Regions:
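Conserved short alpha-helical segments that host acidic/polar catalytic motifs at enzyme active sites
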Residues: 1-233
């Protein structure tokens, strides 16, 4: 069972992400990774086969100052345990990084569609199609691109999207795979389960199926799958 963590706020993101992944180790996994925005406003991905502590050792030496990021522990479903198959995955333009829990049942069909449209896919996973589908649908409006991507997918998903085109935001979506959002005065948090973020907040909202959320350090805005705004009390 995979684990997801995300954070955007006033603190350095990497320690929050690593602590969250360590708190989700009980779910079982074979690889771990994270993505943050570096000072050049491009996506920095660090991932590898093995334990979260291995990932922690790699990122410590980089001293990444980013205050926004997404992270993941993977339990192999499509594709063997490997660095290449570990999350996050990124599209061919390096503009959209994604972590994903769940199983995309029609990924082979969607993979063929992307290849026919000139995309190159490097992993054996079903997840890698997601950032490339967002790229395929993107025309300047990421929410529209995410909407069209979600409507392409058959199966289950909990998704986080990070992009330098929207450097203060994380985009998330959920269907048949758990995702919880935590809010606080020093930022907002995302996780697949409460233990990953309970150290930082006790204000939680469990997303419902077919919801999309746009999260920055001060706010969370919800939409249905057709991008109609949802008011959450």
């Amino acid at each position: 069972m995979c684990g997801i963590v995300g954070y955007t706020g006033t603190k350095k993101a990497v320690p929050v992400l690593i602590n969250g992944l360590l708190s989700l180790e009980y779910r079982g996994y074979d690889s771990a990774g994270l993505a943050v925005l570096n000072p050049q406003n491009s996506i920095e991905i660090i991932k590898d086969k093995g334990r979260v502590h291995n990932l922690e050792s790699q990122v410590k030496s980089l001293n990444l100052p980013s205050t926004i990021g997404i992270a993941h522990t993977r339990w192999a479903t499509h594709g063997i345990p490997s660095k290449q198959n570990a999350h996050p995955h990124i599209d061919n333009s390096n503009k959209f990084a994604v972590v994903h829990n769940g199983i995309i049942e029609n990924y082979a069909e969607l993979k063929n569609k992307l290849i026919q449209n000139g995309y190159t896919l490097y992993s054996e996973t079903d997840t890698e199609i997601i950032p490339n589908l967002i790229n395929f649908h993107y025309d300047g409006d990421i929410l529209k691109a995410i909407e069209h991507t979600l409507k392409d997918l058959k199966g289950s998903y909990a998704i986080e999207v990070l992009s330098p085109l929207y450097p203060d935001k994380i985009f998330v979506a959920k269907k048949d795979s758990p995702l919880v959002i935590g809010t606080s005065t020093d930022g907002n948090y995302i996780a697949s389960d409460i233990p990953a973020i309970i150290k930082y907040t006790h204000n939680f909202y469990f997303m419902e199926d077919n919801q999309i959320a746009v999260i920055d350090k001060k706010s969370v805005n919800f939409f249905d799958i057709n991008l109609n705004p949802i008011k959450i009390d």
